[in-house]
A protein has these predicted regions:
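NAD(P)-dependent Rossmann-like dehydrogenase/reductase catalytic/cofactor-binding core
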Residues: 138-141, 145-205
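Internal alpha-helical scaffold of NAD(P)-dependent oxidoreductase catalytic cores
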Residues: 41-49, 65-102, 113-153, 197
């Protein structure tokens, strides 16, 4: 199977798609472009096979998550493409464009939310523990690896929180402060803003 990967900024996607159509006859196209619906492309050409894929940046380490939506790929070809993306991490198949938009805002953008949060850890450790940046980042990386392993083995986030937060202990104090400052609502608003923007991009084309 020969496929063409469409991986450009949304503002350049339609022109790039038209160039692909000029140079390939009935191409098999996998779009990595955020926001733009399959129907937007298919209106320009309904003979090509087309699907959307939305990986996140951890794919380059083989630990990514990729959402796939099959618009018009033959089933056998879709399976082959899915197999390719599975080499870069977990693959999730969704059944409509809207779910790709949701995935983009939550999982596609997800690493940046964690990185932003971890900057607070980095800043605090460097200031209080007098450690250099390299050591602090190694500590944070191992912290996140441990979190990931805990989720894989247990899975229940409430149980994992209870296992760390002793009554009247340091973790409980920290969690109470985060809750009183509406951390969950802040994250919810951030996720909703990203999903909204993904849908706005879709409506621009």
């Amino acid at each position: 199977i020969d496929i063409v990967i469409l991986s450009v900024k949304p503002k350049d996607a339609i022109q790039a798609y038209k160039e692909i159509l000029k140079n390939y006859k009935n191409p098999k196209i996998v779009s990595l472009v955020a926001g733009i619906k399959s129907s937007t492309y298919i209106k320009l050409d309904n003979k090509s096979e087309f699907m959307r894929a939305m990986p996140n940046t951890a794919s380059k380490y083989g630990q990514g998550i990729t959402a796939l939506y099959n618009s018009s790929f033959k089933k056998s070809n879709f399976k082959k493409v899915s197999s390719i993306f599975s080499k870069f991490g977990t693959v999730i198949e969704v059944d409509n464009d809207s779910k790709i938009d949701t995935f983009t805002g939550v999982i596609g953008s997800g690493p940046a939310y964690f990185f932003q949060t971890l900057k607070s850890f980095e800043k605090k450790l460097m200031r209080l523990c007098n450690q250099d940046e390299k050591i602090v980042r190694e500590i944070i990386a191992n912290l996140m690896k441990g979190v990931g392993s805990s989720i894989e083995k247990d899975g229940d986030l409430d149980n994992l929180i209870k296992a760390v937060a002793s009554k009247k202990g340091t973790t409980e104090a920290g969690l109470k402060s985060l809750k009183s400052n509406n951390l969950n609502q802040i994250f919810e608003k951030g996720l909703n803003a990203a999903i909204k923007r993904s849908k706005e991009i879709s409506n621009e084309f």
